[in-house]
Amino acid sequence: THAGIEDLHMLLECRFFPDYIILPKTESAAHLQIVDSLIMMAGSYFRLIGIIESVVRLNAVESIADATPRLCGLMFGAADMAADIGATPAWEPLALARARIVAACAMKGLLAIDAPFFDIGDFSGLKEETLQALSFGFSAKSAIHPAQISVINAAFTPTTAEINHARAVLTENAKGVGI
């Protein structure tokens, strides 16, 4: 939007360069390319994360994922997507949208970031949904409250057994032996 471009212009003018900018309602690959050009003209380098929040944007997710090398991830906007398709923001009605985002990110080596869990006080539900996101292929989950961060981090942190297994696989791979 015009307001978003103004915000970006002010950010670039004040020479404050964050590590990331999250772009809500990422419209298309062209949308990201415009932002990329503005950042480049300012002589800055920070990464972009696009949010996929509608059926139209989901339909273009592969081209959005390929828009610019500055893009490091795509985030799923579950609430807006649910509203767009007339569904509840539960896991099942949005599984296809999540799968498309995860696949597009995997194809391009991007972070796939799941939508936030909106019930701030329900840590059991947050843990369950975060583990589901992990098993679905997401590499991260957004948080809407600082109290959620430890639950999300715990779910995405590999266990000692998982680390040991990964090391064993790497050791065998270095030997040229399959497991």
Listing of model-derived features with the role each one plays in the protein:
Residues 1-179:
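Expand to "…catalyze enediolate/carbanion chemistry for C-C bond making/breaking, isomerization
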